[in-house]
């Protein structure tokens, strides 16, 4: 349980109350949520298909993320017999244009490549020159 008397808590409440740009990442942020929203937006998706599509995510984490997204009214859990599937809610669907724009921006500016390069250890000879070039520190 978080201390509601802390300065950090009060600052967060103030920021989330007054800045829409601060609130949105709290709802869709994290390592997996945007990716899950993107895969689910194509239609009703089975849990097992999500597991296969995103191999690095553990079953436990996938369950947790989907439950939280269901709680936040971003996805709808559909149970048919033993099959569990997920679909976007109206709120989740309203995020799709923003996600598409974000994906386009990321591709245009090669953001994934820049982040990957930044994460590459400097002791790898092949990566050193590229890393310095991307950062503009040649």
Regions found by a protein language model. Give the residues of each.
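Amphipathic alpha-helical dimerization/coiled-coil segments
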Residues: 2-8, 16, 38, 94-138
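N-terminal helix-turn-helix DNA-binding core of bacterial DNA-binding proteins
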Residues: 12-61, 80-93, 116
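C-terminal flanking helix
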Residues: 53, 68-70
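Residues within the DNA-recognition helix of helix-turn-helix
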Residues: 65
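Glycine-centered, phosphate/nucleic-acid-interacting loop/turn motifs that mediate DNA/RNA or nucleotide
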Residues: 73
């Amino acid at each position: 349980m978080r201390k509601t008397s802390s300065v950090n808590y009060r600052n967060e409440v103030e920021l989330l109350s007054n800045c829409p740009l601060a609130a949105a990442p709290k709802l869709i942020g994290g390592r997996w949520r945007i990716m899950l929203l993107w895969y689910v937006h194509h239609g009703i998706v089975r849990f097992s298909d999500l597991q296969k599509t995103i191999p690095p995510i553990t079953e436990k984490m996938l369950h947790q993320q989907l439950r939280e997204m269901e709680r936040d009214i971003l996805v709808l859990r559909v149970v048919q017999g033993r099959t569990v599937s997920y679909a976007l809610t109206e709120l989740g669907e309203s995020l799709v244009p923003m996600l598409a724009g974000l994906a386009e921006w990321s591709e245009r500016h090669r953001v994934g490549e820049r982040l990957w390069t930044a994460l590459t250890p400097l002791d790898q000879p092949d990566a050193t020159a590229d890393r310095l070039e991307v950062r503009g520190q040649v």
